[in-house]
């Protein structure tokens, strides 16, 4: 199954800006991989909360549409809130 998530490049980085994003129901994330510069991105909580519950999400390639450009990635890690059904941060790796 293929998954597509709309995302934007983050202009601010750091703990304070990440907290502001989470408060606005956004998920801060990073895309990294060998030979490429890491990208810090942000996307809506509603875009990922349901699809990440699928069993094949972590083994399938995911298409992130970052500011209109398709980027193929694979989910590597998700940090979840301790008791709320929220994703606090996501790590993706370039494919």
UniProtKB/Swiss-Prot annotation:
Presence of keyword RNA-binding: yes
Pfam families referenced in this protein's UniProt entry, alphabetically: Ribosomal_L25p (PF01386)
Cellular component, GO annotation: cytosolic large ribosomal subunit
GO molecular function, one term: 5S rRNA binding
Disulfide bonds: none
Protein's UniProt keywords contain Ribosomal protein: yes
UniProt keyword list: Ribonucleoprotein, Ribosomal protein, RNA-binding, rRNA-binding
GO BP annotations listed: translation
InterPro entries found in the cross-reference section: Rbsml_bL25/Gln-tRNA_synth_N, Ribosomal_bL25/Gln-tRNA_synth, Ribosomal_bL25_short, Ribosomal_L25_dom, Ribosomal_uL5_bac-type
Oligomeric and partner information: Part of the 50S ribosomal subunit; part of the 5S rRNA/L5/L18/L25 subcomplex. Contacts the 5S rRNA. Binds to the 5S rRNA independently of L5 and L18.
UniProt-listed HAMAP family: Ribosomal_bL25
Family note: Belongs to the bacterial ribosomal protein bL25 family.
Protein role: This is one of the proteins that binds to the 5S RNA in the ribosome where it forms part of the central protuberance.
Protein name as catalogued: Large ribosomal subunit protein bL25
Protein species of origin: Shewanella denitrificans (strain OS217 / ATCC BAA-1090 / DSM 15013)
Upper lineage: Bacteria, Pseudomonadati, Pseudomonadota, Gammaproteobacteria, Alteromonadales
Record gene name: rplY
